[in-house]
Amino acid sequence: MWFFNINGNNFYFTFESLDHKPQFFFFFFLLKIICLVTVILCLHEISHAQNYYVSNQRASYKGTNVLSRMEDSVKKQFETQQLTWPPEALYIRSFKYDRQLEVWVKSNRKEPYKLFKTYKVCMQSGTMGPKRMEGDHQVPEGFYQINEFNPNSNYHLSLGLNYPNASDKILSDSIRPGNAIYIHGNCVSTGCIPISDIPMEEVYIIASSVKAKGVDFIPVHVFPVRYNVKKSFDYLNASIKNNQTLLEFNKNIREVFDYFEAKKQLPVILVNKKG
């Protein structure tokens, strides 16, 4: 008796004599053909789904032609910098005091990230320190990921961050921690990261193209300052020198900044019970 389990279903085949071997081998040949066809169809569906995602983003956007033209521009910029389009991975990091947002990409998982471009954050709200409750107008600080693509945002285009993250849920107000934090176009802000319209189109195109390749995790790290810029670091120290909680918080998140600066790779980030 031969036993097989396919997709949770059990199949039993009994052969009374060696005379049944030809049928047995024919069955395996047929099974191989079925598996091969299934794989080809799955790959086709994945490719179709990816193309559909990008097309759907464009179709949903009120300025479809704008996104198409912008994609051509972004492709040329990638080519000029000898970067692979579309990238296999995308990493975004922003610096509050320095008013900058960086876009890093790489063509495969093992290679280090390469900087594509640094954009200006055109409006800033709040002060140094993380967001801790609804209505505090603070831009979050910490480690997030993109969890929403909105081609019809009131702020041109927007990418949502998963605030509150695991740490925020521990350290922020338990009832009203706040929500709806975005990287977006336009130039207004009450706790978000606005980079104006044209830069947002570029970032949105890159992010949606990476998403279309099946990448669900697009990390976004928000730091209070560039720790390796003296003016910025001095400002941070002056702002939080009497706040032990913020001093400890910055010590923790700076470790991730330093790791990336040295290796151009992202470390594994875990959150303990203390946040």
Segments predicted by a language model, with ranges:
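Hydrophobic alpha-helical signal peptides and transmembrane signal-/tail-anchor segments
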Residues: 3, 14, 24-32
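A conserved hydrophobic position in a structured secondary element of the catalytic/binding core
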Residues: 195
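Acidic, Ala/Val/Gly-enriched low-complexity intrinsically disordered segments
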Residues: 16-19
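Cell wall/extracellular polymer interaction/catalysis modules
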Residues: 50-190, 198-218, 227-275
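Short internal beta-strands
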Residues: 221-223
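Bacterial N-terminal signal peptides
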Residues: 32-42
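Sec/Tat signal peptide C-region and signal peptidase I cleavage site
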Residues: 45-49
